[in-house]
C-alpha cells in the first residue's frame, strides 16, 4: 500500500495559489502533497548578451531549497560560495521546460526569470517547480499583454511535469520522499498539453527496467500530467 493509500496512478493532492507575493510580475505557491515551492516570475526589458540584436526574448530559471525545507538543516549554497551540481541541473531543466512553452520571437527582446524556492521538500521538487513556474510565467506574460507591451500572447502551451517510478516492482505516479528513496527506477517527465514530451529523465537505481516498463511509466506520466493541466487551467481561470 502506498503512503496515504493512494492508487498507483494517483498524484498527491495538487494546489496552486496565484498572486502569492505582491512584488513579482507572477507568483505562485504550488503544493504537491507536502512538497511546497514558491515560484516567482520577474520581467526585465533586456536579454543576455548572446541574444542582443536577435529580436527574441529569453526565459531562464533559478532553483534553491531553504535550509530547513528538509528533515535536517542544509547549509545555504550562498554560504558555501557556489551552487551544487544538483541545483544547476535542476534549474537548467526548469528553464528548458519553460522555454518550450513560449514563442521567444513573439516575446521580444526581454527576459523573464523564474525563481523556484523550495520551502518544504517531500519528493518531486523539480517537477513541482516546473508546474508552478508555468503558471507564474503565464501571469507575467498576461500582464505584458494587458498593459499593451505585447500585442500577441507568446504562450504556445502549458507545461506540466511529474515523477514516476518503480517501487517494490510496481509502477507508480508522483513519488513522495519515502517512495523516491526506495525506488528501483526513478523518472521525471515534462510534457506539453498535446502530449508531446519536452524531457524524460530516467534512471534505474536498482534493477534495470524493461521496454514494457518504460512504456507503462510514460503512460502513467501522461495520465498524471493531464490531471495537472486541469489544475493549472482551473487556477488560471480564477
Curated annotation (Swiss-Prot):
Homohexameric ring arranged as a trimer of dimers. The keyword Iron does not apply. Pfam families: RNase_PH, RNase_PH_C. GO terms for molecular function: 3'-5'-RNA exonuclease activity; tRNA binding; tRNA nucleotidyltransferase activity. The keyword tRNA-binding applies. This is Ribonuclease PH. InterPro entries: ExoRNase_PH_dom1 (IPR001247), ExoRNase_PH_dom2 (IPR015847), ExoRNase_PH_dom2_sf (IPR036345), PNPase/RNase_PH_dom_sf (IPR027408), Ribosomal_Su5_D2-typ_SF (IPR020568), RNase_PH (IPR050080), RNase_PH_bac-type (IPR002381), RNase_PH_CS (IPR018336). Keywords: Nucleotidyltransferase, RNA-binding, rRNA processing, Transferase, tRNA processing, tRNA-binding. It catalyses: tRNA(n+1) + phosphate = tRNA(n) + a ribonucleoside 5'-diphosphate.
Amino acid at each position: 500500500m502506498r503512503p496515504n493509500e493512494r492508487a498507483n496512478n494517483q498524484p498527491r493532492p495538487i494546489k496552486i495559489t496565484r498572486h502569492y507575493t505582491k512584488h513579482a510580475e507572477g507568483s505562485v505557491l504550488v503544493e504537491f502533497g507536502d512538497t511546497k515551492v514558491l515560484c516567482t516570475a520577474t520581467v526585465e526589458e533586456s536579454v543576455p548578451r548572446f541574444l542582443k540584436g536577435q529580436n527574441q526574448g529569453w526565459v531562464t530559471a533559478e532553483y534553491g531549497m531553504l535550509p530547513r525545507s528538509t528533515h535536517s538543516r542544509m547549509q545555504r549554497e550562498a554560504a558555501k560560495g557556489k551552487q551544487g551540481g544538483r541545483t544547476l541541473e535542476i534549474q537548467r531543466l526548469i528553464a528548458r521546460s519553460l522555454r518550450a512553452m513560449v514563442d521567444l520571437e513573439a516575446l521580444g527582446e526581454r527576459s523573464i526569470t523564474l525563481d523556484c524556492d523550495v520551502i518544504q521538500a517531500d519528493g518531486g521538487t523539480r517537477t513541482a517547480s516546473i508546474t508552478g513556474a508555468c503558471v507564474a510565467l503565464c501571469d507575467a506574460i498576461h500582464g505584458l499583454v494587458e498593459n499593451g507591451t505585447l500585442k500577441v500572447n507568446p504562450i504556445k502551451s502549458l507545461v506540466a511535469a511529474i515523477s514516476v517510478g518503480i517501487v517494490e516492482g510496481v509502477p507508480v505516479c508522483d513519488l513522495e520522499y519515502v517512495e523516491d528513496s526506495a525506488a528501483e527506477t526513478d523518472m521525471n517527465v515534462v510534457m506539453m498539453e498535446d502530449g508531446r514530451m519536452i524531457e524524460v529523465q530516467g534512471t534505474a537505481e536498482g534493477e534495470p527496467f524493461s521496454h514494457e516498463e518504460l512504456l507503462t511509466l510514460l503512460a502513467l506520466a501522461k495520465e498524471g500530467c493531464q490531471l495537472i493541466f486541469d489544475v493549472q487551467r482551473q487556477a488560471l481561470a480564477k
